[in-house]
């Protein structure tokens, strides 16, 4: 009961506080009634005990004294306490007073509770039933004990004193609410009684006469605790009497960790961790949390500090780790103000920083190129396709001429779609190594690395050739270095090519030249081989026809009137093309190339010369590596579509170019192409089933079919 009353959870005083030591009857103790009257002025707490006698802090009058108020406003320590009332009790007949009507002694007769309510014992007698207080009024009479409960009013002096010193709290360890209303207290859970967690320290209500007597000394030593309204931090964080006043958890009700500036002491731990992990200065999430706890920093501050530290080391050219692309370390933008100030104060290392950043970018580009190389397939195939000497290079300075499938640049690879000008350049230069008349082109073929420095404007050292990435291939205005120097001087190349053609006509009879060039239509150079199965069932027949008829220029953005002389030039170079597909009105060139008049050949050469001069103005526009759904060459007139051969003729063409049926010795050529029959025929047979229905009814195709039948029968027999 005493502990319960001490912390202010109940308004009932204990029996020892209500009764003096001389009256210890159970009846009187149980007869005391505490009624809260006028709570705005009268507190609900028990009066303080006097340190001298253990009695109530109320002055006792000697018996037989004069009637009246014994403590009319006296404030001395031996007089009434601050919360006591100057109430006089009319004694009963059996009291200890000398006179019958004199005032009774408070120690023997009545008692006062904490609310200023006087209790009068009515144990029978002649003088019972008087007024309980001078200015009080009786409230009720106890039916059990017959005592009269009356309420005594305060005078103005005591009311002012009580409101000054005892209004928030009335006794030791018992406190009232620090908030006048609940509207001003936003946190009701930590409201009234939360100050009971604090240990007594001092009396914040220091009265002027604190050292005037033992009672005031007792007040000071007991030490009234200030209420929660005087503290700026959450009292719930101080369980067990721990007073955390300067910690980072103060000044807020939500117990959140307070962000503070990073000091040298806190960052010393981070620097030590960074020095130990220079190979991999990327702390994990758990390590960041551990470092944040040790340094009393937030997790964001730790991550920002490490990002800034890595950036500083990069700038100072002290980078000892491989750059990583990690999503959880993309907080380089979270640079704190003090870190920015530190970087501004540091001397700028502009040249070293730019060099190191350029090195980092070069490393990242090389990594990306390596990834592209892994995705595209074997490096040997790609190097041979780009013009580098491969393992199967022939002795005649012709890359990929050794007969091995790995060194063959036109070898089938499902994801290996070369640049469109790749086939064109190979086709233009395909006759030159075969005739072998120009030594300059031979030297260009033998040293392809010399062309690396001038393509795409990206210098790459000759000692370390790299596979070009797909992004460079698509984005460059000039073609990638895959053409062995043929595209560097197109006009000069065209002139040399025409000279080679004239020499070929003088070297062989006209009929043999036509047959020979028809024999090597697409087979003299491996670049000319149409990719018969590269598109499988997707666009197998159509792309096969395009590759065959359009001479390995699968996608051309030139208008039809410009395509026609270009294709005529290609037919002139190859000698025995079946027909043209530039437009529906284009001339159909028969196979009898040797029957053509020399004047007509000269006219065609002049046309090709004009086309070459147009080409000298710039290269063909770079095309994407992946084919579109509808290639531009498919958007020709329907009459031109009827001129396309069916896919059933493509394996015949492949058979013809692989055959040795004309009686020429195989040793007269750089390689024996009949050895490639096993390489080409399965893929050609695979795609032979995809025939185009739009071209099956053409009479010209039937005529061409009749021309090929004897060759096919002769080879199979």
Swiss-Prot record:
Biased composition (Low complexity): 492-507, 559-589, 599-614, 687-698
Residue ranges for the DNA-binding region feature of this UniProt entry: 255-317
GO terms for MF: DNA-binding transcription factor activity, RNA polymerase II-specific; RNA polymerase II cis-regulatory region sequence-specific DNA binding
Biased composition annotated in UniProt, kind: Gly residues: 94-103, 395-410
Any single Gene Ontology cellular-component annotation: nucleus
InterPro entries, per the entry: HD, Homeobox_CS, Homeodomain-like_sf, Iroquois_homeo, KN_HD
Positions of the UniProt region annotated as Disordered: 46-80, 94-130, 317-371, 395-418, 478-516, 549-615, 675-717
Record-linked SUPFAM superfamilies: Homeodomain-like (SSF46689)
Biased composition regions of type Basic and acidic residues, renumbered to the chain: 317-327, 337-347
Subcellular location: Nucleus
Keyword ATP-binding tagged: no
Any GO BP: neuron differentiation
Gene3D superfamilies (UniProt xref): Homeodomain-like
Sequence similarity: Belongs to the TALE/IRO homeobox family.
Function: Controls proneural and vein forming genes. Positive transcriptional controller of AC-SC (achaete-scute). May act as an activator that interacts with the transcriptional complex assembled on the AC and SC promoters and participates in transcription initiation.
Record protein name field: Homeobox protein araucan
Organism per entry: Drosophila melanogaster (Fruit fly)
